[in-house]
């Protein structure tokens, strides 16, 4: 039997009613109260997520920038200390190794945050391409991550932080902030489509911080949230999930994150030729939104048809808690990607009518 990995918060899940599942080799809570309740809490008040399964890699040294420019698609030279950047790592054929966040903590000090299922693969990929005086260290086991997300997230977190959180703008961060006396890196980032913060602290401090935040946020409606709501929230906001919208066979351009690919940067990064070609002349496939008109919920890998021609497949789908509609994301032949194109999805051996719709499905009002 495979032993599942656990985050430093595992022992407190039960106290809050956490129901755990196997998620890519990790024993993580899929929900605490209910996915719907947690989803709605984040859209209307706030939710707290344990995302300590995510990986963290430190890149340091004189050649750290030159190295990162070679292995990621975005232009890291534009990043200032205190800034975060969303980017991807690609194979030479343009397929995606992973999507990630880069935090610039110092002129020669970067923190990379990578997907849990890819930690070993990413670390090996980075280490095998390291150049000059750059070092790559996997610090995943030492770092815990909590995400507090939702319109009331700032007010709740402000109760246990003396620094003015309004000063931390979107995709910016402050290092060594004290959160209820615990040193942490606090960034205004998230994976829900709402305002919020991601808090990085030492593994041994995570449980105390989790309990304190839930305590001080209770009157504002802060709820403990699991993977289920995290997935429906990111899906409504059309944020890609590695293994579904992104993979070794799907390029960032196809997945709709071309904004994180800077083919005009001088550095010759992995996948640049393919991605440049796709940026200039269009990719063969495109990630689109689909709404099911008849009964049925589109799920990952369900085929999409026009007539007898299979034009692609669903990458993610659900009954949207916010929109009360059955919607999906599908990677399809670009010829059929125009909004209002009528398609069919095969759900349990039955074709159901659907239509291509604009994305994101949900965008918060400022």
From Swiss-Prot:
Enzyme class: transferase
The UniProt record lists the keyword rRNA-binding: no
Entry keywords, A to Z: Aminotransferase, Transferase
UniProt-listed GO biological process terms: glycine decarboxylation via glycine cleavage system
The protein's Enzyme Commission number: 2.1.2.10
InterPro entries named in the record: GCS_T, GCS_T_bac, GCST_C, GCV_T_N, GcvT/YgfZ/DmdA, GcvT/YgfZ_C, TrmE/GcvT_dom1
Organism domain of life: Bacteria
Cross-referenced Gene3D superfamilies: Aminomethyltransferase beta-barrel domains (3.30.70.1400), Aminomethyltransferase fragment (4.10.1250.10), Probable tRNA modification gtpase trme, domain 1 (3.30.1360.120)
Keyword Transferase listed: yes
GO MF entries: aminomethyltransferase activity; transaminase activity
Catalytic activity: N(6)-[(R)-S(8)-aminomethyldihydrolipoyl]-L-lysyl-[protein] + (6S)-5,6,7,8-tetrahydrofolate = N(6)-[(R)-dihydrolipoyl]-L-lysyl-[protein] + (6R)-5,10-methylene-5,6,7,8-tetrahydrofolate + NH4(+)
Entry coiled-coil feature ranges: none
Pfam families in alphabetical order: GCV_T (PF01571), GCV_T_C (PF08669)
GO CC list: cytosol; glycine cleavage complex
Protein family: Belongs to the GcvT family.
PANTHER family, sorted: AMINOMETHYLTRANSFERASE, AMINOMETHYLTRANSFERASE, MITOCHONDRIAL
Subunit structure: The glycine cleavage system is composed of four proteins: P, T, L and H.
Purpose of the protein: The glycine cleavage system catalyzes the degradation of glycine.
Identification of the protein by name: Aminomethyltransferase
Name of the coding gene: gcvT
